[in-house]
Amino acid sequence: MVMGYRVGIDIGGTFTDLVYFDEYSKEFHVVKVPTTPKSPDVGAINAIETAKIEFDKINILIHATTLGTNMFLGQEHLNPPKIALITTKGFKDVIEIGRQRRPKLYDLFFEKPKPLIKRRDRYEVEERIDANGNIITPLNEEELQKIAEIIKKKDYEVVVISFLHSYKNPIHEKKAREIIKNLCSNVDVITSYEINPEYKEYERTSTTVINAYLKPLVSNYLKNFIDSLKNKGFNGKFYVMQSSGGISNIKYATERPAAFIESGPAAGAIAVAYFSKILNDNKVIGFDMGGTTAKASTIINNSPLVTNEYEVGGEVHAGRLIKGSGYPVRFPFIDLAEVSAGGGTIAWVDEGNALRVGPISAGADPGPVCYGKGNDKPTITDANLILGRLGEKLSGGLLKLRKDLAEKAISKLAEKIGESVEEIAYGIIRLANTTMAKALRIVTVERGYDPRDFVMYVFGGAGPLHGVELAEEMEISSILIPPSCGVFSALGLLLADCRVDKAKSILKDIDEVDEEEIENIFIELIEEGLKEVEGFEEIKIVKQIDVRYKGQSYELTIPWTGDLKELADNFHKKHETVYKFSSLEEDIELVNARVTIIGLLTKPEIKCYEVKEYKPKPESYRKVYFSSGWEETAIYNRDKLKPGAIFEGPAVVEEYDSTIVIPPDYTAFVDKYGCLRIER
């Protein structure tokens, strides 16, 4: 391959971040531009042009986007497709009934999420396969042909086929797809056995419907983006980041868009995992605060924790999606907790005259009040500006902040409550920190971990403004700010590997199977997965099994080492870690076999420098507000801090893509990789 550029582009709710690696100079470069919500690809092209990269010299471009998330946030300019669902007779209401959990037990006015497919667009056909894969009732092809005629007349764009127990025997779904395609050649037909071949009909149907819901939008978006790139001379490889933390080719991305809903946050977790390995930090919390939301993840032994079920379109409450308030998706997702607290999150006063922060965001347009684009509702960014934590210029001086406008907006809140402007601004920061701390507790305490045992890696455009105070609230003693922290998720795109996940239901007691039967299932899954991971010199295969005590509803995923006794022992240990108890006498059930096939990519090298300890000279000083009040604070330029620099707080470190706040009584040190480690 001719030397050129490797480019990572992360489109967030407020900014589009670009990191590129120059294969000639072996240097990383970064660019940050406003997101263009109605046409996200325009912002991405703007970022490349701002970076002055020649399109024909881009060898690899890896992309993460919020497009899937935005679809479930009801953005008006995103038009969902017209979808029909065909299912087993008697089961067309499965996606409406869902699971009988009440996410808010005492809320008499709670409304379940509306089904993505209306009842009039759901059709039933006579067929039945039992839980063992045996045909009880043959597929009624004549009935299906009548449904196909209706589909043709009503101009559906996508048809979802989800039959009972098709994960065990997909013969009826295959035949139904064939009949529909023969009679409706212009309709895209998606079957549940291809998207999610696992038991639980509601989750399988929901996953397939969400995939269908996203597919036309994502396919058109990616096609337009790639066409725009090619028109400008791009001829390199194009990959998309999945929610699992692995990248995939364009074909996989367009066929399974539901696997890409949390692609941006996943890239951030991958960057944290990479740095935790080179820095020998085995327990790490990743904290990412951008313009719209804040996310937390847990990295243990250099690998992010992954969950096999996620909810989209649900309510965000205390850092988590309330189970039952959204739509379940069964794809691997990096286990994240997310809250509505970003730089653009709006502060307001409620009917009881109490200060509130979020969940509404000013977004990329108009943005915070201090951007001067017409917004008059104060945000977290405005509060940081008033408190002196932010300077009056961002992005290397490209974005000038209007402190006078921020003060005017926050003074309105101050008048209502009867406090000073700085007290209200500091109250906004404290409320935001309280909300974000809940997310940190979810990925640690609620997963069975003590946060005091962890190092916290802080990144995102707004994360380092809040990271140290958040760590203090969680009693975390060591904080690390990586280089290019404001575009760290985009950097993570360049540090990821290609990944394909395959699964198959087992649903047998552990004493009903032997190692040979399990290995045969894995052989089948590996053969299937390898077809989708081609062209890689080095491939890694990970085998896992979902395990539970018999009678439980949810499983724990345990590595498969080839020995059933070892599997059982490891399950008991993990159950003890997660739930604080285990039961050695209980029967164990094997639910799903899972294979992850990883095509290893060559990573750009993170440069290491000689460390010579010295005390740097501040660029200037300014007053900054902390818990103790206004403090004369040293201001440093991060680009001028060399490895070995050591200095004490209070301090503010400014760089192109972010600003780092170091309160009094903390010491900061620049390590050999350019990371800023802050300790008390």
UniProtKB/Swiss-Prot annotation:
An example Gene Ontology CC term for this record: cytosol
Gene Ontology annotations of biological process type: glutathione metabolic process
One MF term in the entry's GO annotations: 5-oxoprolinase (ATP-hydrolyzing) activity
Signal sequence annotation: none
InterPro entries referenced in this protein's UniProt entry, alphabetically: ACX-like_C, ATPase_NBD, Hydant_A_N, Hydantoinase_A, Oxoprolinase-like
Pfam families: Hydant_A_C, Hydant_A_N, Hydantoinase_A
Entry similarity comment: Belongs to the HyuA family.
Protein name per the record: Uncharacterized protein MJ0964
Record organism: Methanocaldococcus jannaschii (strain ATCC 43067 / DSM 2661 / JAL-1 / JCM 10045 / NBRC 100440)
